[in-house]
Amino acid sequence: MSHDQPAYGLWLLVILNSAIFILFAFSFFKPATARDWRTFGAFSAFIVALFVEMYGFPLTIYLLSGWLQTRYPNLDILSHDAGHLWSTLLGEKGNPHLGVLHIASYFFLAYGFYLLSSAWSVLYHAQREHALATTGPYARIRHPQYVAFVLILFGFLLQWPTLLTLAMFPILLVMYGRLAVTEEAEMRAQFGDDFERYAQRTPRFIPRMGNGLTTG
């Protein structure tokens, strides 16, 4: 991208992209409880922080500009492509959108949104019947929606890493982990032995080997 066409300061794109992905996730997740809104709010904050740096103000590039110019003297740090830091650090040439990690990110994003949607469908019907969700992705792991959010966030980190989102990511992991524990305490109180048996046979976040995370 040439300097005649600004790479940053595109605040309309910040708003549009943030709104698209937040509303897209909202349509799948449909938060209903205070815990749901905390989960979704943290995800939304990550998305906004990401697109602010992607199209608004490149804080990470600004803070690393001295090191980047010394390490990569031919790098045009004012170009949009320079924001794809993994591509730069790995020494990839050409269009960064065709880089290995960028392509991998599409799979994380696509599967994350797919898992989020599939998990919500199972959970919705279980809640209507006042039953424990144990089918679909819930047959493989106990918290597929939290895993879905993590996959989506990780996918975005592969596309456009920033200092702020890299710092937020482990914090969100801890937050989602604690929310999962709180949720399980409530499920244990509500469903008793049924939940205990479910928890014994179903891992919390990572499916057992040979028991792939599917939605069937």
Task: Describe the residue ranges of each PLM region.
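Membrane-anchoring alpha-helices and their flanking helix-loop junctions
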Residues: M1-T134, I152-E186, Q190-D193, R197-G216
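Helix-loop-helix units of permease transmembrane domains in multi-pass membrane transporters
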Residues: T134-R140
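Histidine-centered phosphotransfer motif of kinases
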Residues: R140-V147
